[in-house]
Amino acid sequence: MKEIVLAGGCFWGVEEYMSRIKGIVETKVGYANGIKENPSYEEVCSGTTGHAEACYIKYDESIISLEELLNKFWSIIDPTVLNKQGNDRGTQYRTGIFYLDEKDLNVIIKSKSQEQKNYRKPIVTEVEPLKCFYEAEEYHQKYLKKNPEGYCHIHLG
């Protein structure tokens, strides 16, 4: 099993979208790569913790490759916009690819470079090693499964 953490704006939609993909074994939403230990949702929303809303993904690479997973990720975000996805604005809504395995970096860089060909503006999606990931409060986990009418900036139809 492989792991990756993806930030694509509001984590509810990213988790729901990713959880529907064949080969995804587990998803959790949380707060990635900030400076405050174990922040609350309210603290992250204040913009003072440096965390991105993100989705931890465990996947079976015999079913889906990292390259395929990243292609799906690129399809649900606008990687050229800083600190905004859909109607959501703030540093916590920035896009990012946070890797746990250094060996994944070449695939990520190649994927980002390939995706850049689709845009005139530069891609601003962060590519960083995962420094920290704090699981979000329980009510955020599988939020759109529990609340199918909930807000989502990603088209899930």
From Swiss-Prot:
Q: Which GO terms describe its molecular function?
A: L-methionine-(S)-S-oxide reductase activity; peptide-methionine (S)-S-oxide reductase activity
Q: What class of enzyme is it?
A: oxidoreductase
The protein's annotated catalytic reaction(s) are: L-methionyl-[protein] + [thioredoxin]-disulfide + H2O = L-methionyl-(S)-S-oxide-[protein] + [thioredoxin]-dithiol; [thioredoxin]-disulfide + L-methionine + H2O = L-methionine (S)-S-oxide + [thioredoxin]-dithiol
- Gene Ontology terms describing biological process: cellular response to oxidative stress; protein modification process
- Keywords carried by this UniProt record: Oxidoreductase
Could you tell me which Pfam families the record lists for this protein? Answer: PMSR
The GO cellular component terms are: cytoplasm
Q: What is its EC number?
A: 1.8.4.11
InterPro entries with a match to the protein in the record: Met_Sox_Rdtase_MsrA_dom (IPR002569), Met_Sox_Rdtase_MsrA_sf (IPR036509), MsrA_MetSO_reductase (IPR050162)
Q: Which residues form the active site?
A: C10
The similarity comment for this entry is: Belongs to the MsrA Met sulfoxide reductase family.
Q: What does this protein do?
A: Has an important function as a repair enzyme for proteins that have been inactivated by oxidation. Catalyzes the reversible oxidation-reduction of methionine sulfoxide in proteins to methionine.
Show the NCBIfam families listed in the entry. msrA
**What protein does this entry describe?**
Peptide methionine sulfoxide reductase MsrA
Which organism encodes this protein? Clostridium botulinum (strain Langeland / NCTC 10281 / Type F)
